[in-house]
Amino acid sequence: MSKLDLNALNELPKVDRILALAETNAELEKLDAEGRVAWALDNLPGEYVLSSSFGIQAAVSLHLVNQIHPDIPVILTDTGYLFPETYRFIDELTDKLKLNLKVYRATESAAWQEARYGKLWEQGVEGIEKYNDINKVEPMNRALKELNAQTWFAGLRREQSGSRANLPVLAIQRGVFKVLPIIDWDNRTIYQYLQKHGLKYHPLWDDGYLSVGDTHTTRKWEPGMAEEETRFFGLKRECGLHEG
């Protein structure tokens, strides 16, 4: 696999970019997660960043990538509506793993947003998408720009939802390379990694949560529900960061 030219790939239409990366992705599918991270660091341009929502299984990708590339900037987009358990989990993992945490927030505070727009998450898909644009997408775009990111690692997995089922290891999103080292891991592999390295699930895992985001758009899992139905009232799975 040869080095890739980000500028040249960004000039291509989306379909052509996918085709241009197809051969590389076929080879990356053969590597394990650590091998994918190592390949990306050797062959893709820096600066490098890792995003995390500090969700249920977040410790895996945080530990895996940080072990190979210590001090990598870890981007968190904080909406101001995370669970108290999430904020404590962020503190715990940041200390335990010595993370280089970079927190980005909307330019409008949560209270100001509610005063201006009402509770956007109660206004259907359109309201949720506006909420996500303000609190997730714009802060992430700002983070990528301010950190001069050219390669972005994330912990998405195909097993998590239908919208992620066909994602490749390597893609281009928001003008940068995006690498998903654990994309093909199943829940058993996640568990084994956590056990091997003395890591924990998010505290709300024990309370029946399979996925954790904001307090007002996250539900406990109930029998018969798909994991993606526990977020955004089942109206959508993605918060916007991993779309586009």
UniProtKB/Swiss-Prot annotation:
Source organism of the structure: Shigella flexneri serotype 5b (strain 8401)
GO terms of molecular function: phosphoadenylyl-sulfate reductase (thioredoxin) activity
Metabolic or biological pathway, per its Swiss-Prot or TrEMBL entry: Sulfur metabolism; hydrogen sulfide biosynthesis; sulfite from sulfate: step 3/3
EC number: 1.8.4.8
Active site: C239
Biological role: Catalyzes the formation of sulfite from phosphoadenosine 5'-phosphosulfate (PAPS) using thioredoxin as an electron donor.
Name of the coding gene: cysH
HAMAP family linked to this entry: CysH (MF_00063)
Stated name of the protein: Phosphoadenosine 5'-phosphosulfate reductase
Organism taxonomic ancestry: Bacteria, Pseudomonadati, Pseudomonadota, Gammaproteobacteria, Enterobacterales
Catalytic activity: [thioredoxin]-disulfide + sulfite + adenosine 3',5'-bisphosphate + 2 H(+) = [thioredoxin]-dithiol + 3'-phosphoadenylyl sulfate
Gene3D superfamilies (alphabetical): HUPs
